[in-house]
């Protein structure tokens, strides 16, 4: 008796997105760690120096987290009201932050009480930063002003009053200690020079500006507001290079990768987009559970931290290369193992027997082998199989139809079982690779269960969904045929124009057949 031949499962190519280097790079993060804060996380900032701790501004507190810690290692809570925009100095030893009451406070990382307090703003301070010389702080507030402060003397040096609405974002140049950028809800981004009493450059963003970012070289400026991210060339007097519109809601934060080759933007649409700084195309995207307010990357992009409106802080760490574990050394076989059978002399009457390889059958193959056709169909109609590997279900249905027992396998089912079959048909009937097999199965089901339609509301609903799917597919096919007919007419018209013949008379009176080339 011949052995049982397993069912051949037809495989199909997986059609998906092209795997790029960016996809591999940005997907190489572990499962995110989520930390609950006391309020919306308005700012996240990494220390530029080891061990690369990061400051989280939420509600009336500033938490300092270690790079791999889930609990704050230090907390600054000397704020009467909401704190904003905690930012590290370049050496990582000082931290500056604004507050709702208009104050600006300077902290030493090793202490708790503020070292300096700058009073001068009359409304909430939403942006602060250190200048490149480390001895000055620039701040912007809801009183429409931008101020420059001297750290050693705790005094105000300059005040700029050129904005006509809230100043909500800003940054200082990393190269020039006299230059700093501010963005406002008056739709403008301005560059100020501490050596003058007015702005030296102004660009119109077109929307309330939520975030600005200056490239380390100082040649490019990025502004975010509304659904737009715009890149400006500062060396050409603020000329607009590109305007990006890849978010569906307001863009709230910007960040640059460690190499400077990738720009990241976070938005209220719960997505973080990664752009190439050469082509300015989206090369990757992250999805989050809530609207995003803040975003920061650690040194060498080892950690990405995102703050959200629901107070959740999402922390992703890059996967480390797996170390090869040293396995215990296997004992070497004894010498007699190697010489076993070496001295055996083959005889003419010896019979050589090959050990047959044992074949392991799948459960549905075992059922088919023993003619349990209904049970085999039940196994492949399990939701786990139909969702993950629908090609197995289709192959079993095809095999049952080839044997002529598909109707027997489908008959005699209760409401729950027939619902599983109809759900699979509804989900996969419109797929071209499965359609020939499933259309035949659908016809058999309709023939079997037509007399009992109307007895079960659940089954009736499934049949109506199947009917609607078939009608929609017929409409699609009709539209495609109409489109093909129109294309055939166009192609036929073009061919006639290319080969049009006209009769022209020659000098001897006989007609000449001449073609006009289009």
UniProtKB/Swiss-Prot annotation:
Example GO molecular function: RNA binding
| Alphabetical GO biological process terms | positive regulation of rRNA processing; positive regulation of transcription by RNA polymerase I; ribosomal small subunit biogenesis; rRNA processing
CDD domains attached to this UniProt entry? WD40
**Where does this one sit in the cell?**
Nucleus, Nucleolus
A Gene Ontology term for the protein's cellular component = fibrillar center
* InterPro entries the UniProt entry points to: U3_snoRNA-assocProt_15_C, WD40/YVTN_repeat-like_dom_sf, WD40_repeat_CS, WD40_repeat_dom_sf, WD40_rpt
Find the cross-link Glycyl lysine isopeptide (Lys-Gly) (interchain with G-Cter in SUMO2). Answer: 249
Q: Where are the WD repeats?
A: 36-75, 78-117, 120-159, 162-202, 204-242, 246-285, 287-326
The UniProt keyword set, sorted, is:
Acetylation, Isopeptide bond, Nucleus, Repeat, Ribosome biogenesis, rRNA processing, Transcription, Transcription regulation, Ubl conjugation, WD repeat
Q: Could you tell me the superkingdom of the organism this chain comes from?
A: Eukaryota
Modified positions (N-acetylalanine) are 2
TM annotation in the entry: none
Record-linked SMART domains: WD40 (SM00320)
User: Subunit notes for this chain?
Assistant: Part of the small subunit (SSU) processome, composed of more than 70 proteins and the RNA chaperone small nucleolar RNA (snoRNA) U3. May be a component of the proposed t-UTP subcomplex of the ribosomal small subunit (SSU) processome containing at least UTP4, WDR43, HEATR1, UTP15, WDR75. Interacts directly with UTP4 and WDR43.
Q: What does this protein do?
A: Ribosome biogenesis factor. Involved in nucleolar processing of pre-18S ribosomal RNA. Required for optimal pre-ribosomal RNA transcription by RNA polymerase I. Part of the small subunit (SSU) processome, first precursor of the small eukaryotic ribosomal subunit. During the assembly of the SSU processome in the nucleolus, many ribosome biogenesis factors, an RNA chaperone and ribosomal proteins associate with the nascent pre-rRNA and work in concert to generate RNA folding, modifications, rearrangements and cleavage as well as targeted degradation of pre-ribosomal RNA by the RNA exosome.
Its recorded name reads U3 small nucleolar RNA-associated protein 15 homolog
